[in-house]
Each structure stands twice: as C-alpha cells, then as structure tokens.
Amino acid sequence: MIPETRKALIASGKSYIIENVPLSPLINPIRLCGSSFGLKVRRHRLFENNLNLEGSICNHKERPIGVYGSLNDEIPKGGKTAETIGQAREAMGIDWAIWTELVEAIPPAYTKYLGNQIE
C-alpha cells in the first residue's frame, strides 16, 4: 500500500509526509522518538517526506512506559506496559484517548515538531 500511496502523492505535485513504523518500505525517512520530546514513551516512527524535514535525536536515558498490548502487561525484556489509562495518556502526551486509541496513536508532539518545520 505504501508504494501506491507514494505514487499518488508524488503525482499530486504537492508536499507530502507518509508515516509508518521502523522497517517499513519508506524512502529516506526521518525518525522521531518520544524521548526526544520529553515523553515517557519511545514510540519510534518513520516519516518519508519531500519537504527536507529533520528527524529527532533519541534520549533513551530513562526506562520507557509501554503503551501497546494490554494495560499492566509484563514486557519480555523487562518492564511493564502502563498500569493505568492516566499513566498511558501522560506518557504519550494525549489526555483524551482510550487505550485502544493510545496503542495506535502518534504523539501530538510529533505533529507539532513536523508542523513547525513546515511553517
């Protein structure tokens, strides 16, 4: 689906950004990490674009809060997912979403960071 989307976006002649996860078939993507924005999640995401945007530098000094799977799950390599919806919301910088939305969400800090580069 990404190649078809890219083709349509390029054909439009307009600026574009395609978001996806690491190892997705994006061309020269930049990477954003929640730790770069003071969030308690890492949530690495890639962004292919034709705008010459800059990625962020990870700051993996603190143990992240997992916002995926189920609440209060053990993580195989150590740690746990968020214990409460409130903790997950705070970790992601999103105060309105339910769990099923949080596990799929892109932190608003990413949108702000990219949007500020476009202005």
Model-predicted regions and their roles:
Residues M1-E119:
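Class I S-adenosyl-L-methionine
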